[in-house]
């Protein structure tokens, strides 16, 4: 009946001349409005709503808006007509780009006793759920859409199940648990358990397929048993068409390449425990290669249906400049150009992702003015500029920025950062002008710094953080990127890092997590940077069968060892990391 509203405003606003619209409207619509003039109360209201429905069906949105704004509603009016009144107002608001106004109409106190078994009730709840999705409120969308699924016709083309599944994939485990605790509905509980089963096996498509089969045997009366969301339906095809011959191009004689190789192999053997149907892997060493194309073509002509690598940025630039590649390729670094090739995917440990995470975290915590403290070199200068750009685009301000060299005098650097040196200069000038020499000087730091963005290794951090405290800056929050953490349990040494908030990968912050084990159990101890490269190797293996899923949009993210991985329109993968803070020398997770 109201199928024209299902999208709830996917079209752009309609501009029309109101006078000509009134004159050209079909006689039945004008007749309804004429009849309504002769009536009052509920009877007039019902006729006007019927006329407005026809206006919207005809695409006459401007007149529909004009007419509906002149209507008064009361809770004593016919419930069905009242729901249409709210739904039509929400539709018009969404068409006009007013999503907040739309949800206010759909959440109106008059919107009570919505019968999901009725066509109007289903349309109303679907519009409401989709509006929540538009407003990035997945929890509310889940609660709303789950009311509808058991009543939804099997032959409808509407993507209700996909909408609900997308919302389920946009909440974390903790949010799912909260929803589950409040749920008394078999339908909603079933959806939650399906999401949990699917998410718990993200490391393996085969294990996900087994988990879905087990869920279907358990939740036999659930609507999704007969109608799985499309991404889950497609999973069997993804498994059957996965790459079976992988060429791995890495500088295995170099520490970075070897660490990635170790991580890749650990994930490979972890998958072997699940299924014997693992891909064939051939290694191509790029340690002494000056140009990648000869080695790349050798790997491609060797029968590979997927190439993972190369690692060197200049090699990735070569591949991008080549244009269309003969084989799907997952490069392990990022090209300088934002351009893309159809079958070139780019994945790595970009520090820009880490900086974005720190900036988001600081902003969410209410900070607006930053000071920057990082090493002095060309590479770090680029990162400093990226942080400044990211922070100022948010509306933040940079109070000061200081660069340091390894082994520098951190006292002078910190005094410069918080303007203690300026306070000392003013004191010296004042003392030189006054005759008395028994004046007591108390240095003061600048008081407009909300937080300090620090880029440093653990050794430098252990000197800088206490120095900040010595110069009256102990209460200024300090945020950092993964370089501040070496990844080992060392409370005595790390005590000097206490209070620093930083972001890092799950591999580093959740070493006992089921997603990482047994992958890391068989690996020797290594430094923090090499551990993160191992995690990258793990994720390169776990990503390899899912590239087309990402490319088609069937999945939008994957919880990996390096973070929550997503992809952009240029087939470049980005990571969302986790936050932690040093407490008593221990890197302690900050749960969101």
Where are these regions (language model features)?
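Alpha-helical protein-protein interaction scaffolds
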Residues: 25-232
């Amino acid at each position: 009946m109201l199928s024209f509203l299902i999208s709830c405003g996917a079209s752009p606003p309609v501009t029309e001349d109101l006078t000509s619209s009134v004159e050209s409207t079909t006689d039945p619509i004008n007749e309804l409005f004429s009849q309504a003039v002769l009536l009052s109360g509920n009877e007039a209201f019902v006729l006007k709503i019927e006329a407005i429905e026809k206006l919207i069906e005809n695409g006459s949105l401007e007149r529909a808006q004009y007419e509906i704004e002149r209507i008064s509603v009361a809770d004593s009016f016919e419930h069905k007509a009242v729901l249409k009144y709210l739904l039509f107002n929400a539709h018009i608001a969404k068409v006009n780009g007013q999503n907040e106004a739309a949800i206010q109409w759909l959440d109106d106190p008059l919107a009570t006793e919505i019968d999901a078994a009725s066509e109007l009730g289903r349309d109303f709840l679907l519009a409401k759920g989709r509006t929540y999705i538009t407003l990035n409120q997945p929890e509310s969308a889940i609660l709303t859409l789950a009311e509808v699924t058991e009543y939804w016709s099997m032959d409808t083309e509407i993507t209700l199940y996909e909408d609900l599944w997308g919302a389920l994939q946009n909440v974390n485990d903790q949010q799912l648990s909260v929803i589950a605790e409040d749920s008394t509905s078999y339908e909603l509980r079933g959806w939650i358990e399906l999401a949990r089963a699917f998410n718990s096996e993200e490391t393996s498509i085969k294990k996900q397929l087994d988990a879905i089969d087990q869920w279907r045997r358990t939740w036999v009366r659930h609507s999704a048993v007969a109608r799985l969301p499309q991404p889950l339906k497609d999973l069997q095809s993804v498994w059957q068409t996965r790459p079976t011959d992988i060429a791995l191009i890495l500088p295995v004689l170099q520490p970075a390449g070897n660490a990635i190789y170790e991580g890749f192999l650990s994930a490979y053997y972890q998958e072997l425990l699940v299924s014997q149907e693992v891909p064939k892997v051939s290694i191509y060493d790029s340690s002494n290669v000056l140009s990648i194309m000869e080695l790349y073509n050798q790997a491609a002509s060797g029968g590979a249906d997927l190439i993972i690598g190369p690692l060197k940025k200049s090699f990735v630039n070569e591949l991008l400049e080549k244009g269309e590649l003969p084989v799907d390729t997952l490069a392990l670094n990022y090209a300088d150009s934002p351009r893309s090739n159809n079958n070139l995917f780019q994945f790595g440990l970009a520090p820009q992702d880490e900086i974005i995470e720190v900036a988001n975290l600081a902003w969410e915590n209410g900070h607006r003015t930053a000071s920057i403290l990082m090493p002095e070199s060309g590479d770090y200068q680029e990162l400093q500029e990226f942080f400044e750009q990211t922070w100022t685009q948010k509306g933040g301000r940079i109070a000061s920025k200081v660069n340091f060299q390894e082994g520098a005098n951190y006292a002078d650097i910190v005094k410069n950062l918080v303007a203690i040196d300026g306070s000392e200069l003013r004191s010296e000038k004042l003392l030189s002008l006054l005759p008395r020499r028994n004046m007591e000087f108390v240095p003061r730091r600048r008081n407009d710094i909300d937080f300090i963005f620090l880029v440093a290794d653990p050794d430098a951090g252990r000197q800088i953080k206490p120095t900040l405290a010595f110069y009256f800056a102990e209460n200024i929050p300090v945020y950092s990127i993964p370089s501040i953490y070496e990844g080992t349990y060392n409370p005595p040494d790390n005590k000097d890092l206490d209070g620093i908030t930083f972001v890092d990968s799950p591999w580093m912050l959740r070493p006992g997590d089921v997603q990482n084990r047994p992958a890391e159990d068989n690996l020797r101890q290594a430094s923090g940077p090499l551990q993160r490269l191992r995690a990258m190797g793990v994720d390169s293996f776990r990503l390899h069968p899912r590239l087309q899923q990402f490319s088609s949009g069937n999945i939008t993210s994957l919880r990996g060892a390096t973070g929550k991985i997503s992809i952009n329109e240029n087939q470049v993968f980005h990571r969302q990391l986790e936050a932690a803070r040093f407490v008593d020398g221990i890197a302690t997770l900050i749960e969101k």
